[in-house]
Amino acid sequence: MTLYQLKVWTIAAKHQSLTKAAGELHISQPSVWHHINLLKNEYRINLYKGSSGRKIQITREGKLFVKYAANVLLQVKKLDNKFKGKRKKRGKQK
């Protein structure tokens, strides 16, 4: 699992569409599908029903997974803001 895979899944779940997620991420729809399949295979869960790029139906496991994924991404963002921000402030003081 990578942070990028989590990001791809949260965006796909938000739109309930692989095609719309691809547009937001500026990558191809097959690339979105590939990243999500890596997650599905690693955790052996079905995140969504449907195989087309149009509308996908998020499964119960998929909804739970996206909540955890979004929380992980939020915590990483907070970590970056906290410690990268300190590094920038220290650099300005010198």
Stretch-by-stretch model annotation:
Residues 1-15, 33, 63:
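Short alpha-helical elements of helix-turn-helix
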Residues 9, 21-22, 59-62:
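Hydrophobic two-helix hairpin corresponding to the core of helix-turn-helix DNA-binding domains
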Residues 12-26:
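Short helix-boundary/capping micro-motifs
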Residues 19, 37-44, 77:
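Residue-level detection of the helix-turn-helix DNA-binding "recognition helix"
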Residues 28, 35-38:
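Residues within the DNA-recognition helix of helix-turn-helix
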Residues 40-58:
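A short LG(V/I)-centered, amphipathic sequence patch enriched
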Residues 60-75:
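Short, solvent-exposed amphipathic helices
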Residues 85-94:
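Interdomain hinge and pocket-entrance segments immediately C-terminal to HTH DNA-binding domains
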